[in-house]
Amino acid sequence: MNREQYLKNLSVPEGKIDVVLDTDAYNEIDDQFAIGYMLRNTQKFNIKGICAAPFLNGKSTCASDGMEKSYNEIRKLLSLAEMNDLESRVFKGSEEFLKDEKTAVRSEAADFMAALADDYSPEKPLYIVAIGAITNVASALLKNPQMTENCVVVWLGGHGVHMPLAASEFNMKQDIAAARVVFGCGIPLVQLPCGGVVDHFLTSKYELEHWLTGKNPLCDYLYNNTVQEADSYAAGKPWTRVIWDVTAVAWLLNENSKFMAERLIPSPIPEYDGHYAFDSSRHLIKYVYNINRDSLFEDLFNKLGEKG
């Protein structure tokens, strides 16, 4: 695509858009909020698919186990939101992370995204929101390089460029090879950095209780799941939680910069030692550098509290 179209595709889209969500839904308590937020914004999103991403931490025995648990969590959330009609659009993702930067990991999710992308164009792109390790998306790109023309990727991953060890953030460090594919291929990319930016998107038990409890089954689940997780390490103590992943969905709703501020920067280069390298001649990406916490939580809580 030409430069004018490329920069347009790095701008918040107008009107209703087709979107795929790629999520490690069981990894944390925030993916569930992001999924719910997307499901409740039907006036903006035509959800083409929800893909389960791999993860490995204390909640999974291996990347494959994390992906399977995320797949089941996605289906649970669709049931709670009374949107079971979307179950046929849920896809299992990669069972392992990339072994190198040239070889795709085969999965339903990667095959689905690679094939779907051919239905789009630079003038009418497919939006892919990724909120976990970016293995599925990188694999799809390796399978179908034309995605760089036909898609836009919005990813919550990495830390702020001003921070040390910025490439050591959880989503990014699990699959640096995948991150290097996505940051290096030239696809229009919007980065929501975690440390130093999105970590300001905090909420507390009492705020969640006020805005969510008793509204609907999805809201009750989000509240109980978050409190249970926090009480597992901070019972009887004050705590807050960052609802990280909501911000990636919210970028697509960020008309007039109401939820966040952004700028163009040359695409950073994630390195295997946990740092970024920088080259001012690289292609531009959109980089979010500030979150309007109160404005976004107001919209999130109001949307989640709707009956469906």
Label the model's feature ranges.
Residues 1-308:
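N-terminal acidic, glycine/proline-rich low-complexity segments
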